[in-house]
Amino acid sequence: MAAEQFDDFDSFPNLVTMFFVRARYRGDAPFLWAKHDGAWQSLSWAEVARQVAGFAKSLRQLGLEKGDRVMLVSENRPEWCIADLGIMAAGCVTVPTYVTNTERDHQHILDDSAARAVIVSTAKLAKTLMPAALRSSQAEFIIAMEPQPAVQHGQLSMHQWSDMVQGNDADVRAAEAAMAAVTRDDLACIIYTSGTGGAPRGVMQHHGAILHNVDGAAEVLREDFGLDEEEVFLSFLPLSHA
């Protein structure tokens, strides 16, 4: 597939289809990087696609359905991107939150979004999240990216990230086929404000609107800066803000 075909963002029905098409084209090329023990390590496009598909499959096996909200509490890391894409690949809606949120902020967002599942990265972030999740009338599942200390989890069902991202090429094909039911008018995510002016407010973003932004950003990077697909970008601003 020619790289030029990726300039036509209007042809994609949703963000996940765009990703899977891109992953097929890029294959084993590095996609996401993170530093571990002082050394940079990468995940390829193909491996990320398998993890995204595996995570989507696991969410559906938990009983999550199209339109269900999944809250994401994590610092910038490759798992953040995989979680976001996997949530949308399951037909669900990502609810990203700031790592600086207070317990009260988490409580408000959980109640306002009616999130059925919550993904949390570290034990430190879980300290402010768990009390709010335990009080939530809608939350059912906690998915931990890293091992968590033994804490009271009440009615919440606890799951480990590593168990939920086991996917293969067949899962990728199934996930891509399932995305035919998701259109540009479907909700992709609900981004909450920081709450500095009161309670955080959710802004609904649909697949089509984000694809339009992707199209505009790609044009600027390509025409104004002369960047191509081999460029490496450092993620500095919180992904939850984007």
Language-model features: where?
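Conserved pre-ATP/AMP-binding loop-to-beta segment of ANL
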Residues: 27-30, 144, 159, 169-192, ...
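Conserved AMP-binding/adenylate-forming core of the ANL superfamily
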Residues: 31-85, 102-107, 160-165, 207-208
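Short hydrophobic alpha-helices that are characteristic scaffold elements of the AMP-binding
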Residues: 85-93, 112, 241
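ANL superfamily adenylate-forming
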Residues: 126-184
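Conserved ATP-dependent adenylate/AMP-binding module captured primarily in the ANL superfamily
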Residues: 99-131, 213-234
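AMP-dependent adenylate-forming
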Residues: 18-43, 150
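Conserved structural elements of the adenylate-forming
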Residues: 49-54, 184, 203-225
